[in-house]
Amino acid sequence: MHVMNCVSLVSDKENGNIATAPGFMIGQTPPPAPPPPPPPPPPSPPCSCSREECPSSPPPPPPPPLPGEPPIPPPPPGLPPTTHMNGYSHLGKKKRMRSFFWKTIPEEQVRGKTNIWTLAARQEHHYQIDTKTIEELFGQQEDTTKSSLPRRGRTLNSSFREAREEITILDAKRSMNIGIFLKQFKKSPRSIVEDIHQGKSEHYGSETLREFLKFLPESEEVKKLKAFSGDVSKLSLADSFLYGLIQVPNYSLRIEAMVLKKEFLPSCSSLYTDITVLRTAIKELMSCEELHSILHLVLQAGNIMNAGGYAGNAVGFKLSSLLKLADTKANKPGMNLLHFVAQEAQKKDTILLNFSEKLHHVQKTARLSLENTEAELHLLFVRTKSLKENIQRDGELCQQMEDFLQFAIEKLRELECWKQELQDEAYTLIDFFCEDKKTMKLDECFQIFRDFCTKFNKAVKDNHDREAQELRQLQRLKEQEQKQRSWATGELGAFGRSSSENDVELLTKKGAEGLLPFLHPRPISPSSPSYRPPNTRRSRLSLGPSADRELLTFLESSTGSPEEPNKFHSLPRSSPRQARPTIACLEPAEVRHQDSSFAHKPQASGGQEEAPNPPSAQAHQLAAAQPENHASAFPRARRQGVSVLRKRYSEPVSLGSAQSPPLSPLALGIKEHELVTGLAQFNLQGSQGMEETSQLTLSDFSPMELESVGHRGPQSLSASSSSLTPMGRDALGSLSPALEDGKAAPDEPGSAALGSVGSSDPENKDPRPLFCISDTTDCSLTLDCSEGTDSRPRGGDPEEGGEGDGSMSSGVGEMGDSQVSSNPTSSPPGEAPAPVSVDSEPSCKGGLPRDKPTKRKDVVAPKRGSLKEASPGASKPGSARRSQGAVAKSVRTLTASENESMRKVMPITKSSRGAGWRRPELSSRGPSQNPPSSTDTVWSRQNSVRRASTGAEEQRLPRGSSGSSSTRPGRDVPLQPRGSFKKPSAKPLRNLPRQKPEENKTCRAHSEGPESPKEEPKTPSVPSVPHELPRVPSFARNTVASSSRSMRTDLPPVAKAPGITRTVSQRQLRVKGDPEDAAPKDSSTLRRASSARAPKKRPESAEGPSANTEAPLKARGAGERASLRRKDSSRTTLGRILNPLRK
């Protein structure tokens, strides 16, 4: 095949066409690197190749062309050429080219046809490639390499041949290892041997020199090398080195001397360092006083722990015992005896804790060992001594090493001395710690102290961590205690705060200053008794609160400057739910401050921080203060023309027996000016008349009554202000009808309406004497029952706020709901209580938020009007009268057994609440105050709870005791839940027994006693609704209160309003306990809620609850009890009347 190819290639060459074609194709295909790659003319490349090769090898020109084409073969068109190209072209002399991997066209497709390749063949002469250039660029260097390789090969071959000529004496493997070792020195074997001979170790390390010792020839090898008599130059590298080494005398000793000389200084330096460290560590242990103190502490602790035992009373202990301290666990988790020792050391001196810092070298001894140091030193001695002895045989070597040996010996002696000193000190240390020299080693001693230092430091750190943790825990506990205290203070003092004697005393001492804490509303906690469930709260945006606010604004504008409420001691509250202000009847600043403080206290009890003060106590104090200031207070009120409805929950004190002793200066009796409409002229009897007047709290007055008081205020106030003593029962009797008309009777027991001193209502301008009833319980006290109830839920309502009430004629906002409208004492029977009082009353009775009470107040005014209107028709006596004229509120004087000091606002009439929500039932309650609304009942529970906490006396007759247990404690009692008072629709309210109804009785006795007896005669209710409606401001006319007022005429007939007022009345009913009961019945949509619930209960026990309430009151006086019962019945009637309104 190859021959054929060669022939074909030769023929192609001869043809020339092919040769030219390949040349052309090469020109045509510059990309192909190989010069003869043209596929169709593969022979042509051979031609060129052959041309080139012909001179070199003319006989085999064909084969060379093939080899010339192998670079082209990838593209050769014909297989034969390809194989031929793959032939021996490379083996030929021609330079090999890099292959160009292309795809060739079969030759048969190209030849004999007209195509680009045949054309190119024709024009090949025009395009010729520079073969030399392409060879230079793409020729492989293999040729050169091969040429050089053969030369190198020849050289190597010659060297190998020479090596082969070398003589190898040593083992091949050993010879190789030695050769590798020697190459690192980059010196000839002879120079290395010369350095060894001369003892020059500078250029060699100790390790290198030691390697020389390893490669020293063995005896057999020495014999062979010595036996070698041939050409030394022919020996291998290793053999040559060993051969030259054995020629050096004592070569082995010389190398050893070189190694010792090289290693001696480092070894000596290391020994010096180690010995120094050990000796220093020994000194540290013996001189560290802190360590010694720690050891003594350990000894003391051990003796204490082991006292009485065989190990007790020890004088010392083994050092190894130090490590056992951590193993003795303490009773305290995570603590052991070592921790205790560390604590004791800290107590003694904190410096003791840092003793380990003075044992710095002891820590370094961890890597050292006295034995190792001694062994190393001994080795140096041996080596030096051996060398010294051995070199004696070789004078030349001895001279070389003489200086070194002298230096080494000197150093070794010095080290030996150091070592000896170290040993002595070690023994001294062991003796110092009373250890056995034979058993205790220095290394062990150091190890014990190292471990002890480590453990002690860890114990110190643990103690610090523990102390820090304990401090953090204590801090957390303190914070928790503070939080708990703050909550407790909030719950006990701020939440559900009711008037208490303590607060009264505090305010007595501090005066106006003491009011500041009470003016700040406190958060209501669900756990606090004053907490009002959200479902019973009314949003400030609700219609009731907005109406109340409008009414408040209206009253303020009508009465005069908004500051007038302050004049009447209606203190502004910081929050919308502020405690209701006390009546302004108390002129003197002290009295006013007391009143305001009292009012705020009850207000606080309603929803603020103030500690619950027994309403009775406050009432007594207020009453006492009022008699002193009533005269001036009333005139001022009149002059101011401000219709300030004081706490509608405060009982009309004037209704109490006129003979009750004056209250203590702090007993802030709410002087309520009632415009008794349709009532006989008041018997203003000296102090009695004033007291009764004071007993008739402003809550007894309907807003219109207050307004009329404002108009009549100067006269009636002058008359009433003549004395704060409660009016004679006759006068009270005369008042009672008006109260019945205005629903005063219901209001009196539960809450004395704060009569607006200045009459904002022109209709009420009737010049009738206002009863400035100094309620034995402060207006705030009165609020305790009714307001307290409301205030608890409403704690921040502005209506309850002193100013809010004042501006609304605070009684209107709070007491006005029930008492103001119910007590139209000063207003003509025909006149309806001002809508203001009505609004205030609903706010109180409604149990809605104070904002809502404001709305209620607006609504209540109409209600009161309607109640009053109904009350004129209804006879006060009996529940029937109550139902008809439950609105009317009879003024009751204190019975002989009663006194103002005993007076407290006790919602007695609420007992009938369980009867059902019916204002008509209020008429049945006639003597009793307004039936507690469902809210009142709820609040009554809360208030009764607070009353219970405040004082038993504050607790009114237990509702459970009363037939319907609807009787409510005065403002103090409101917290007591009235179980019997339940609206059918409203959730049943538990009856809370009023532990001290007597105090409340006194309040009620004052308000109710006269009321019930005289309410009956005063049954003629003053249909003031028409008047009230005209009076109702435009904003109040559209309110529920206005509609309820309009409906109030129908109130007596409509006895069922349970569904309407349940939520609102539940709390407010409680709040309105005594004065509120009347008030809700009288007027207030809010009251309506309470009265609604109260009527329900009152029908069941309208008289019964009142009787139950009266029972405690009977303790104060049979008259009071009777009056309370009458009030309860009247309240029932009012509740019945109000129920329709609520609907």
From Swiss-Prot:
It holds the Pfam family FH2. It is found in: Cell projection, Cilium; Golgi apparatus. Coiled coil: none annotated. Residues 16-89, 517-638, 706-1143 are annotated as: Disordered. Residues 87-482 form the FH2 domain. Microtubule-associated formin which regulates both actin and microtubule dynamics. Induces microtubule acetylation and stabilization and actin stress fiber formation. Regulates Golgi ribbon formation. Required for normal cilia assembly. Early in cilia assembly, may assist in the maturation and positioning of the centrosome/basal body, and once cilia assembly has initiated, may also promote cilia elongation by inhibiting disassembly. The FH2 and MBD domains are essential for its function in regulating Golgi ribbon formation. This is FH2 domain-containing protein 1. It comes from Homo sapiens (Human). The gene is FHDC1.
